[in-house]
């Protein structure tokens, strides 16, 4: 389990004002153990699967940043439109903002501009700074602001945190490197209201049971009055969905195949070579989701000595690397209500491509 406890743990090479808590990093022994556990859980099943969190080493995070700028990939633009329009409503009253799966923190800047204006006066910094914060449920105009980005990629997160400290000199930044699906709390926060962000449509990467476990975990570590903002992709034309995950430039293909490199580099194995695979994105209408696969272009035999396991794939067989569920707003709101989150607002972009739902813990 990974606790959200910024300000403790490894702080090597931290920029001024940044303390990075490292719980899981791809090149660490802990990451090897975590990936081995994930492989044992899914790689030897039918079909073999690997959780999408293993996309995001430093290269994978940079590739995904490129994907968000592609013409075919509408979710980032649509979500950004909603964030720009609703930023004041989203951050109102919050003194701590926690982003799960923060990555480069690029999409969050529109909220940070409203939450802690660049160079704004009266913003506290450093652990324990309150600077006029009032009790939970509201804050004074000069209340300290704290941002806690959480991500699995230590390299990317550390770089992003350093940039944020320079761009928002009054903002306390406490990055946490760890698995966002295994947080045991308690959530960090100044006195005042906490806002948890889960953007980018990542909620769609979970199976039904995984989503239930994730929401139950969040409810367990959040307090009454805390708010949760979730980004979700809306159901639309299958052709448009497939194009968003199989772009003409091949960036998504490189992103997908990079996971093969991550596995080969992180765990001891032989016979695993990205040149033996190709990228595929397909629409699964029955599950209302896009599926990403790496398909073997020839017969492969992979040996994992430390696991005492092998896996053979015939040409044409694949490894499922991601699912991306598409939602109807009412279904997601009902799901959240069943886990103790009450709807406060649901927004979509002008084109009706993407949605944000803001809920509060009862």
Model-derived features: positions:
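Conserved class I S-adenosyl-L-methionine
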Residues: 94-103
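N-terminal auxiliary segments of SAM/dcSAM-dependent transferases
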Residues: 2-53, 61
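A short glycine-rich, Lys/Arg-flanked "PGG" loop and its adjoining helix->strand segment in the class I
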Residues: 212-224
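Class I SAM-dependent methyltransferase Rossmann-like catalytic core
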Residues: 47-89
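A short SAM/SAH-binding and catalytic strip from SAM-dependent methyltransferases
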Residues: 193-212
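Conserved SAM-binding loop of SAM-dependent methyltransferases across substrates and taxa
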Residues: 104-119
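Conserved beta-strand signature within the Rossmann-like core of class I S-adenosyl-L-methionine
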Residues: 221-235
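Substrate-binding/catalytic lobe of Class I Rossmann-like enzymes that use SAM or dcSAM, i.e.
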Residues: 240-325, 329, 333-339
